[in-house]
Amino acid sequence: VCCPFGRCHQICQCCER
């Protein structure tokens, strides 16, 4: 799951720039 914020979170394994 990617964060809509575009930052890396502990909940999200996917990081989008």
Curated annotation (Swiss-Prot):
Listed A to Z, the keywords are:
Disulfide bond, Secreted, Toxin
Indicate yes or no for the key word Transport. Answer: no
Chief subcellular location = secreted
| A cellular component term, taken from the record's GO annotations | extracellular region
Where, subcellularly, is it found? Secreted
- Molecular function terms, GO-annotated: toxin activity
User: What S-S linkages are listed for this chain?
Assistant: 2-14, 3-12, 8-15
Give the similarity note: Belongs to the conotoxin M superfamily.
Note what the entry says on domains: The cysteine framework is III (CC-C-C-CC).
Query: What protein name is recorded for this chain?
Result: Conotoxin ar3c
Say which species the protein is native to: Conus araneosus
